[in-house]
């Protein structure tokens, strides 16, 4: 049974519902604006197809709730517990998720714009085919997250820990990933444009067939990684560490490999035409 009329009646009388318990409520299609639910509890609450704007969910508990297909604008989720929440196919604009717990969340096919996820826990979350524009994920945890076919533009992922995450077939444009931990991550068939990976850790990462022309890889650690047939034309690998990397058929045309460490790397059929190999260590 829908609880929409009940919640609307409550917030019309008192828009400040901090600390309330709305667990299990069916709020499908509800439209709320300017309401505060700080420290409130919304366990397993349905807010699918809802329209939410200027809502305060800071430090609220919303575990296992559903915002599927919701339109969410300028909502504050900072320090909230959102474990297991689904935002599948939702549209989120200008939302604040700073320091929130988003483990096992589902953002599949959602559209995120101007959102702040700095310092959030997104372990085991799903961003399958999600569109992310001008968002901040700096220093967030995304261990073993599923980001296959994600489209990311003009966003910050510096210092993120995305060990073991799946970013295969992803498309990134103007993304800052400096100092990111991406050990054993899957970038198979990704397309990176104007991406900065300086000082990132990609030990054991999979970059087979990746399209990364012109990308910044300065001082990156790619030990034991697989770059088979990847395109790094014009990319910057100055001081990069590629010990035992698989570079079979990799295109380094006009790339900067100066001072890079390629000892025991597989260079069979690798293309280094017009590449800068000054002080490159091959053996």
Language model segments and positions:
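Tandem repeat scaffolds
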Residues: 3-283
């Amino acid at each position: 049974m829908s609880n929409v009329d009940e919640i609307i009646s409550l917030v019309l009388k008192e828009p400040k519902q901090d600390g309330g318990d709305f667990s299990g409520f069916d709020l499908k299609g509800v439209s709320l604006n300017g309401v505060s639910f700080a420290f409130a509890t919304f366990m397993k609450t349905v807010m699918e197809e809802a329209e939410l704007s200027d809502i305060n969910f800071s430090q609220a508990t919303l575990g296992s709730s559903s915002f599927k297909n919701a339109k969410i604008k300028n909502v504050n989720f900072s320090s909230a517990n959102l474990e297991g929440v689904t935002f599948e196919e939702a549209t989120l604009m200008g939302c604040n998720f700073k320091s929130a717990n988003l483990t096992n969340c589902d953002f599949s096919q959602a559209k995120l714009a101007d959102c702040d996820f700095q310092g959030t826990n997104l372990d085991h979350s799903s961003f399958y085919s999600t569109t992310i524009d001008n968002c901040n994920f700096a220093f967030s945890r995304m261990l073993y997250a599923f980001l296959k076919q994600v489209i990311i533009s003009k966003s910050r992922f510096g210092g993120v820990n995305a060990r073991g995450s799946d970013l295969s077939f992803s498309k990134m444009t103007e993304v800052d990933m400096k100092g990111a931990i991406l050990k054993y991550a899957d970038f198979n068939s990704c397309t990176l444009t104007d991406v900065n990976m300086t000082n990132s850790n990609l030990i054991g990462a999979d970059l087979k067939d990746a399209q990364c022309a012109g990308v910044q890889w300065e001082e990156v650690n790619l030990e034991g990684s697989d770059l088979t047939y990847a395109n790094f034309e014009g990319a910057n690998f100055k001081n990069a560490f590629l010990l035992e990397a698989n570079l079979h058929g990799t295109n380094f045309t006009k790339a900067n490999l100066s001072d890079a460490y390629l000892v025991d790397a597989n260079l069979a059929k690798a293309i280094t035409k017009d590449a800068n190999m000054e002080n490159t260590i091959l053996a």
